[in-house]
């Protein structure tokens, strides 16, 4: 396809118009008095949201050059969302401010590469200053609640639920968000290790009212192959039957003669027994069986390791305080594994999480980690309508990610104050030349933008409040919700340091690319050729 080539000011101005179009749509959502954005869809009802990245993702501009600018800032929002889970609006506002200030200087003759070097130096200094400002959250339930409430757009109910979930499962635990059947929003915590495999036969059920299998202090046999014949199982079944304890078999599958004999023995009351398929597939199944073995103090019976069912002894079986199984899930509570061995396994999984590049693998490793170290909490989000449900679920997701970020890297004063305080660190920063010094000044002015936007969304003059907050020190800032100047940390207005850091780094990265752009290539849309050839007339004599 033919390309239209734009150079210099024409290229950069087009990109800036796109940046402004997207940023202006996104920034109306910032702060406690930020407004909603309603997004029309070509099918279904409209979506109402206050989530910056949801707004950014929907924006496509008609002009191809402007659209390139918008897409670059969209990248800021989505990358910030991927890395920190929140702060997408802050990142967009910062990117717009850096681009605006930077292009003014480029138009006045500054060298774009020197400006970019100055911007990068300033960002590095601010990030170091944020690290000094950060305070550790640990397991402080109040701080977790405050962060979650702010990220959920000042919804204290959501904040409280997330704090409850964190208190129950700890920072290693997994918290997932699901849609509730009714209008109530609540937390459901699963104790112990749960995996998504139910009983292989309903005849194993011990509680007909709940249709569940409940086994107290059972032995647990872990086998990585299929069990089809009863003969294989007899060396295990006989000593277990003599002990009088129940038995749970977790294997690749149990079928044929083996399954039917187990069911008959269960119904006759000769054995308390149940069988489930092993969770996962392939290598992940082997790893999860090993996790269960470590948790329960058992051994995986695997021919790869030289073990067979025929030579399995009762000492090789795992133990747990309780096991409950329904048609979809198996939950093992209080496994008898040794704490040190479990801890080593947890550290091994953490190491794998750090080295893997796949988001999917990372998610699965996090789930395994939670099942071993913490637990699993499900946050059920309820609402009166589908539109409200989607909007609320977005906010809960944001709050959850922000809380994780806070636990990971600590917290700083919210409401744009932490960035404003970091300006002081730029005063001593040395530049190699005048344009680099200008780049540092660009960042110094741009980091006022989040506070300015929060104030303007609250209906006040941004410059006045920014000047007043700048006069103060420490955590002194402006509470837009109550229209007061307060100590931000004491008032519970806090941001995760990771969110602030990632927002600034991503904004500076994309802004630098726009400032150093000298040429833009755009597809030229081909004019539609006329319609096809007209239909010929019919043959003579035809109607």
Curated annotation (Swiss-Prot):
Domain of life: Bacteria
Enzyme's top EC category: isomerase
Gene3D superfamilies: GroEL, GroEL-like equatorial domain, TCP-1-like chaperonin intermediate domain
Gene Ontology terms for molecular function: ATP binding; ATP-dependent protein folding chaperone; isomerase activity; unfolded protein binding
InterPro entries on file: Chaperonin_Cpn60_CS (IPR018370), Cpn60/GroEL (IPR001844), Cpn60/GroEL/TCP-1 (IPR002423), GroEL-like_apical_dom_sf (IPR027409), GROEL-like_equatorial_sf (IPR027413), TCP-1-like_intermed_sf (IPR027410)
UniProt-annotated binding residues for ATP: 29-32, 50, 86-90, 415, 495
Keyword Nucleotidyltransferase: no
Localization per Swiss-Prot or TrEMBL: Cytoplasm
Pfam families: Cpn60_TCP1 (PF00118)
Name of the protein in its database record: Chaperonin GroEL
Origin species: Flavobacterium johnsoniae (strain ATCC 17061 / DSM 2064 / JCM 8514 / BCRC 14874 / CCUG 350202 / NBRC 14942 / NCIMB 11054 / UW101)
Gene that encodes the chain: groEL
